[in-house]
Amino acid sequence: MSVVEYLKKLSKLHGISGREDSVREFMKKELEKYCDSVEIDNFGNLIAKRGNKGKKIMIAAHMDEIGLMVKYIDDNGFLKFTKIGGIYDPTILNQKVVVHGSKGDLIGVLGSKPPHRMKEEEKTKIIKYEDMFIDIGAESREEAIEMGVNIGTWVSFLSEVYDLGKNRLTGKAFDDRVGCAVLLEVMKRLSEEDIDCQVYAVGTVQEEVGLKGARVSAFKINPDVAIALDVTIAGDHPGIKKEDAPVDLGKGPVVGIVDASGRGLIAHPKVLDMIKAVSEKYKIDVQWEVGEGGTTDATAIHLTREGIPTGVISVPARYIHTPVEVIDKRDLEKTVELVYNCIKEVNNFF
């Protein structure tokens, strides 16, 4: 299975924050083929290890995706919900969803007051998620409950993976099944040869709601160095200034120098030196980023224990946190090469 095939399979799985079971199970079965040990910690993180000597390097990718959770069922069987993770409300209206009921999965659609019944001033306003609902076809509260829906039932977005042109893919949860796919492919390649370091491949939980799993797993592993794998915003489409997001699809993985204007991660200089040297040695094109917006698992990892030298390598993506994220397959493959060779060279830098 190639890294692209891994991504296609992972994207189709459903696993919002705190409900990553199906993603974890798939990754566990794959990593058991390539690693010396695989375990699930008390928090739900998946921790696989390869090698028993040399420096400890932690490679982390979060398994969770954004989603919804049912908080109320009205008398007519419509579901009101809260958001799990960072969602911009207009991107979810009229989308198809999967409601993961106790009796099996149900298809639903997100609805709201139709524009035909809105006043003119209403049409100019953004429809907030509080004014949306999920329609599962139930005709009463009792029927919705009988179908297996309860308070706390989790909901994920329904979206297939499609090829866009020659080199692009679109689908849901590329944030961060992209990182998970890279993690699996890297460990598969490492399984075919001897290594002189200890590699911890970690599928973290609950990144989208506070970087929680990364903090717990990093404390347990206490690595010498860590790299978080994620996506970052590509600014190569209309509506965004190049200076605000100078990252393009198809030009290679992105190395984060700073994110959240320094409130998140300030990447350790030794990690940046390693990535730069490896990219030059193996002729891997990379992009460099100083970010002002969000952050990644790297923020939690680098503040663990006495501090862990940490960096982040991302795959550029368009339309992050929507059901139609877009990435370039070439960036995915180059990210595998970069991470793989960083692991091979880690003892030369730490």
Swiss-Prot record:
Binding positions (a divalent metal cation 2): 175, 208, 321
Biological processes annotated in GO: proteolysis
Record's keyword terms, sorted: Aminopeptidase, Hydrolase, Metal-binding, Metalloprotease, Protease
Highest taxon listed in the record's lineage: Archaea
A single GO molecular function term of this UniProt record: metal ion binding
Residues of the active site: 207
EC number: 3.4.11.-
Annotated residues for binding of a divalent metal cation 1: 62, 175, 230
Cofactor section: a divalent metal cation
CDD domains cross-referenced by the UniProt entry: M42_Frv
Similarity annotation: Belongs to the peptidase M42 family.
PANTHER family: AMINOPEPTIDASE, AMINOPEPTIDASE YPDE-RELATED
Name of this protein: Putative aminopeptidase MJ0555
Species of provenance: Methanocaldococcus jannaschii (strain ATCC 43067 / DSM 2661 / JAL-1 / JCM 10045 / NBRC 100440)
Organism phylogeny: Archaea, Methanobacteriati, Methanobacteriota, Methanomada group, Methanococci
